[in-house]
């Protein structure tokens, strides 16, 4: 019985993880600016006129601290500024920059995906360096603790 329960739990967790992972199409559109630690703008020449030829991509599966007026406390603002600086630096230093698009964001004005810098995921870089937490739409944990 324990084996059956263990196998069932493993299967459920595998399915849940797979739902978080979205297939991504990779493009080499130029990055135009860094908005914050987990959001970057890039040239989008595929958009028809009169639409602006730029889109934002939010790094899927992470949450970085907010900065400026969106921060809930001075500590979050400082962390948000640091995450933004990290992302800018990583993009500037990279020789090869790719946009990996998974889907449209729930708000419709930007896409979800990842930024691939010299073959490395910005998502993983942000998490490994302490500038982001994994996030898949659940209630966010405060950065003010």
Question: Language-model segments: what does each one mean?
Answer:
Residues 4-12:
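Sec-dependent N-terminal signal peptides
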